[in-house]
């Protein structure tokens, strides 16, 4: 069974700079490296589903084997979808065009910077590949939600002896 990578990204209107960037990232960075690792890439505007698009998007966010989230433009929909993905503790790769500041809540997570030039796309593909290898090797998923959730679970099952240590971590 083929693995699925869902692409969370600002899409923009047909013909817009936002759409052009989304298409270039998909075609020249994400698709080539994901195909190499056996993933089919799905993006919201390319989905053939009929009915509620939001339902189909959320289903992909939850069930996809991998999500690549493009934080370029600080799009609210992208961050909403990324937060949903975080709550499921599943593999996610964050990317952003250039050296753009990203919001505090996700800034401490590794974010791969990309450019849509030939050399920039090659650099981004190598970095995504390194992250994909780590995911394929079974390394655990870390994000702000999973970290706090783990600590809360430990805290709920802790003894009085280690409660003080846990309180400093929370």
How should these model regions be labeled?
Residues 1-47:
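Conserved N-terminal substructure of TIR/SEFIR domains
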Residues 14, 50, 101:
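Flexible, glycine-rich phosphate/dinucleotide-binding loops
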Residues 19-23, 54, 121:
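Flexible, glycine- and charge-enriched loops at secondary-structure boundaries
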Residues 31, 42-69, 73-81:
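TIR-domain catalytic/interaction hotspot
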Residues 73-134:
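Cross-kingdom TIR/SEFIR domain
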Residues 111-170:
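C-terminal interaction surface of TIR/SEFIR-family domains
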């Amino acid at each position: 069974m083929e693995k699925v990578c869902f692409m969370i990204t600002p899409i923009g209107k047909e013909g817009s700079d936002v759409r052009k960037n989304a298409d270039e990232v998909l075609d020249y960075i994400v698709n080539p490296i994901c195909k190499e690792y056996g993933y089919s890439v799905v993006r919201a505007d390319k989905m053939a589903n009929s009915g509620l698009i939001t339902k189909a998007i959320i289903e992909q966010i939850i069930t996809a084997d991998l999500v690549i989230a493009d934080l370029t433009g600080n799009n609210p929909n992208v961050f909403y979808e990324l937060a949903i993905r975080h709550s499921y503790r599943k593999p996610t790769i964050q990317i952003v065009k250039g050296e753009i500041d990203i919001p505090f809540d996700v800034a401490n997570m590794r974010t791969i910077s990309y450019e849509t030039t030939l050399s920039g796309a090659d650099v981004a593909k190598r970095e995504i590949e390194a992250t994909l290898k780590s995911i394929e090797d079974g390394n655990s998923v870390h994000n702000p939600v999973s970290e706090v959730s783990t600590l809360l679970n430990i805290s709920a099952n802790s003894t009085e002896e280690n409660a003080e240590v846990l309180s400093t971590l929370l």
